Amino acid sequence: MDYHDPYFFGYVLGFIHLLGTGAAIHALLTVRTSQGAIAWAMPLLFIPYFTLLPYLVFGRSSFDAYIKARRQANQEMRIAIGDLNWRPWMEEAVAARRSEAYAALRAMPKLGNMPALANNKVKLLINGEETFGAIFQAIREAKKTILVQFFIIHDDKLGRELQSLLLEKAAEGVAIFVLYDRIGSHALPGAYIDKLRDGGVQIKAFATRGGWLNRFQINFRNHRKIVVVDGLKGYIGGHNVGDEYMGLKPPLAPWRDTHVQVIGPVVACLQESFAEDWFWATRELPPLSLPDEFPEDGVLCQLLTSGPADAQETCSLFFVEAIHAAEERVWITSPYFIPDEAVTAALTLAVLRGVDVRLLLPSRPDHYVVYAASSLYAFDAVRAGVRVFRYEPGFLHQKVVLVDNEITAIGSANLDNRSFRLNFELMLLTVDSDFSSQVESMLTADFNLAREISVQESHETRRLHQLGMRVARLISPIL
């Protein structure tokens, strides 16, 4: 091949543009939203030299082959669970449907394919010390099984404390299963994993698919955080395993996050969620445990799982339904605010209904492009009448929804496109006035430490900053 041929580079450029055109067509056919399709297709058509590789890494969001494989694995898992006659919540589900609180959930049980269950005990854990203090104490008391799932596990002080506890319990004969996300925990060294494995802990990485090409695919991250001990106690929320979640790493310290401890029949749903992801990673079921008895009364709870293999966009629909359900107030906290059109419309309509609509966002960025895009969406929300606050003391990472005086949701889902369509997420919904009152007190304290964004501020942003935010928003559908 003559690289000095004057036509050579023309052929190369033409070939790249041909590939870009093919990728643009693929984006138009497969990306779920029109905004995302356009955000990919235009650059692929006009500047494919810079966008083909990012599309290979970040794009292909529908990823049909993966979705089919995941759905098939989920079906196989349900068949395997059916063979175990695993139906632990029948009485609690009937009791839930008969309760007055059940009507507050409306579409949620069908949306999440998990039943609403009565008779649960829930405890709010409002920082890293409370969360990991409770989790580690439960692990120390474990007798039979421990299920652990996190998006991020670091080999630092907190990570090594978890490792030490798990090795100690494995030596006592407790069956331990650990699942981590391969992308979120990309910095986790092999020595950390090997030490757990050598000590008798079963540990696996959650990955999208096998194959050389899919090594470049970093979408479809498993963002869920689950700990279940002996089928008795479950933990769900926003914390990962790392010193930053304990507020030990400036400049984001102190870290603001929230977890929930739950005891009762909904813990069986947490185990099913873990089993679904574990089955995908191993094609085996972990042991599923039930207590001898459930609490006789307590809180109505529902676990809402969501992911890219769902038949509908479960996470986005959850936020839309929660906002539409609000009659007096809807307060939402999230580290990121990149809503789709449906969520934006729901927030606007809630304001027009006279609902007290508040958003609590961080004042410090952990991802600058996402923060810039979030800022522009926040300004739009303020101009629509939404009260938007920025948490001042440190980084806000909690994912909490409070609707009126009964409904709460706490878990892993952010108010952004990635949680809506790309990540595997998990939220715990509760219907209980006493627990909602606790969440209200927690959020009120957070709002008191926050600065409200004014309409004037949204108009006074410098032109250069506005340009940066608009560029960030342009690519926000693919973030």
Curated annotation (Swiss-Prot):
> What transmembrane ranges does the database entry give?
8-28, 38-58
EC number(s) reported in the record: 2.7.8.-
Q: Where is the PLD phosphodiesterase domain?
A: 218-245, 392-419
Gene Ontology process terms (BP): cardiolipin biosynthetic process
Keyword field contains Transmembrane: yes
| Residues annotated as the enzyme's active site | H223, K225, D230, H397, K399, D404
Please name the GO terms that the record assigns under molecular function: cardiolipin synthase activity
Q: Which Gene3D superfamilies match?
A: Endonuclease Chain A
CDD domains cross-referenced by the UniProt entry: PLDc_PaCLS_like_1 (cd09155)
UniProt catalytic activity = 2 a 1,2-diacyl-sn-glycero-3-phospho-(1'-sn-glycerol) = a cardiolipin + glycerol
Q: Where does the protein end up?
A: Cell inner membrane
Q: What keywords are annotated for this sequence in UniProt?
A: Cell inner membrane, Cell membrane, Lipid biosynthesis, Lipid metabolism, Membrane, Phospholipid biosynthesis, Phospholipid metabolism, Repeat, Transferase, Transmembrane, Transmembrane helix
Q: Name one GO cellular component term.
A: plasma membrane
InterPro entries, from UniProt?
Cardiolipin_synthase, CL_synthase_A, CLS_N, PLD-like_dom, PLipase_D/transphosphatidylase
Its membrane topology, per UniProt? Multi-pass membrane protein
Q: Cross-referenced Pfam families, in alphabetical order?
A: PLDc_2, PLDc_N
Q: What does this protein do?
A: Catalyzes the reversible phosphatidyl group transfer from one phosphatidylglycerol molecule to another to form cardiolipin (CL) (diphosphatidylglycerol) and glycerol.
Q: HAMAP family attached here?
A: Cardiolipin_synth_ClsA
* Annotated family: Belongs to the phospholipase D family. Cardiolipin synthase subfamily. ClsA sub-subfamily.
Q: What is this protein called?
A: Cardiolipin synthase A
* Organism in which the protein naturally occurs: Pseudomonas syringae pv. syringae (strain B728a)
GN (gene name): clsA
